[in-house]
Regions:
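Short, acidic, metal-binding catalytic loop of nucleotide-sugar glycosyltransferases
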Residues: 21-30
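A conserved acidic beta->alpha catalytic loop
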Residues: 29, 37-46, 95
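Conserved donor NDP-sugar-binding/catalytic core segment of glycosyltransferases
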Residues: 100-130, 194
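Acidic donor-binding/catalytic loop of UDP-sugar-dependent glycosyltransferases
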Residues: 43, 93-108, 184
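Membrane-embedded multi-pass helical conduit in multi-pass membrane proteins
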Residues: 246-324
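Short aromatic/hydrophobic "clamp" motif used to bind/position activated sugar donors
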Residues: 88
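Catalytic donor/gating beta->alpha subdomain of glycosyltransferases that bind UDP-sugars
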Residues: 171-234
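Glycine-rich, basic loop-to-helix element that forms the pyrophosphate-binding segment
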Residues: 67-83, 104
Length: 350
């Protein structure tokens, strides 16, 4: 079974070594590695070439392609098109792969050669109070996942090259949320099944969550802008606007200026905060196991701030994406739902 591992890079000099070292340490060696560089200006391609030369005995053939200006979708498509294997395993620069990642990711094909795609999992490399709080707020734990509805990130996923071709590749018109639309297109190929993806929770990759609120804002602004461009999660965004623009002002107004029982406003605010932060606080029990009691309290206090920053970033980014979509409404690629037919709406981490 020939397996090609593909990834894209752009100015990843500071992070790419983690991925390359973990690729060299795989218990199931890939048959080839294809990397597409989007035109890095920080010497990433040179670093990759030097690493490959130094670790030639530990690596399969490595093909490095340079495609200046390629976004992540274009980079993945270029790498997959150049890959020789009928099975593609995709990951991202900057992650650290578990040594058994590839072995676990391709194992379903040994049990069922008709497997179409496999969804791996991802866990945070969180070491300090802030990154632990960030991970608990925005990332699911294995216990949160329903295998029948899980849509994988392309930092840990495998699929046949035929499935990629039938999906039309990754959508190059979309700069963010591109792997979500690709997942929908793969799922549409197995309409009689709950999911086209076999869930492989032990195919794990580790990555570092955002280390500042500024970078987190930018990330979630772009995610929501991608939602707007692709017309994703209308109800979810509507609920967010209603919460912040209607429910929250109403509760605050009653708490401070109500004509009767102002305590009801405060009670509503407290209940809202608890519901808002309950699951992240529960995740802190697992993710913050190595923190001191004081550090866990500090992480718990950060959770509401992280949630608010993420939500405000989404509320700022989503209408920008919607406006972009309206300006480009004549683009046939935007009508992806029509092309896929009645596609099921699966849950994603939010």
């Amino acid at each position: 079974m020939h397996v090609s591992v593909i990834t894209t890079v752009y100015n990843e000099r500071a992070n790419i070594r983690r991925l390359l070292e973990s690729l060299a340490a795989q218990t199931r060696r890939p048959d080839e590695i294809v990397i597409c560089d989007g035109g890095s200006s920080d010497g990433t391609p040179a670093l990759i070439r030097a690493f490959v030369a130094e670790h030639a005995a530990d690596l399969p053939p490595v093909l490095l392609l340079v495609e200046p200006g390629a976004n992540i979708s274009r980079g993945r498509n270029v790498a997959i098109a150049a890959a020789a294997g009928p099975i593609i395993a995709a990951t991202d620069a900057g992650v650290r792969l578990d040594p058994d990642w590839l072995a676990q990711l391709v194992a379903p094909w040994t049990r069922d050669p008709d497997t179409l795609a496999v969804a791996g999992f991802f866990l945070p490399d969180a070491a300090d109070v802030f990154t632990v709080a960030m991970a608990a707020t925005v990332l699911p734990l294995p216990a949160d996942i329903d295998p029948d509805t899980f849509l994988p990130s392309s930092r840990s996923v495998a699929f046949t090259k035929t499935a990629w071709a039938d999906a039309g590749g990754y959508p190059e018109w979309l700069d963010y949320c591109e792997d979500l639309l690709f997942d929908f297109a793969v799922n549409a190929q197995r309409p009689g099944q709950p999911s086209a993806f076999v869930y492989a929770p032990d195919a794990r990759v580790y990555f570092q969550p955002r280390t500042s609120l500024r970078s987190f804002w930018t990330q979630y602004y772009r995610y929501a802008r991608g939602d707007g461009k692709a017309d994703l999660w209308r109800k979810r965004h509507a609920v967010r606007y209603a919460t912040y623009c209607v429910a929250l002002p109403a509760l605050l107004g009653h708490a401070f200026f109500g004509f009767f029982a102002r305590w009801l406003g405060w009670a509503g605010l407290l209940v809202g905060v608890w519901l808002y932060c309950r699951r992240p606080w529960q995740r802190l029990r697992t993710l913050g196991a190595d923190l001191s009691a004081g550090q866990r309290l500090a992480a718990a206090a950060l959770v509401p701030a992280i949630r608010v920053v993420g939500d405000v970033a989404k509320m700022a980014g989503y209408p920008v994406g919607v406006a972009w979509r309206r300006r480009h409404r004549q683009n046939p690629e935007l009508r992806w739902r029509e092309r896929l037919g009645e596609t099921r709406q699966f849950k994603t981490e939010d």
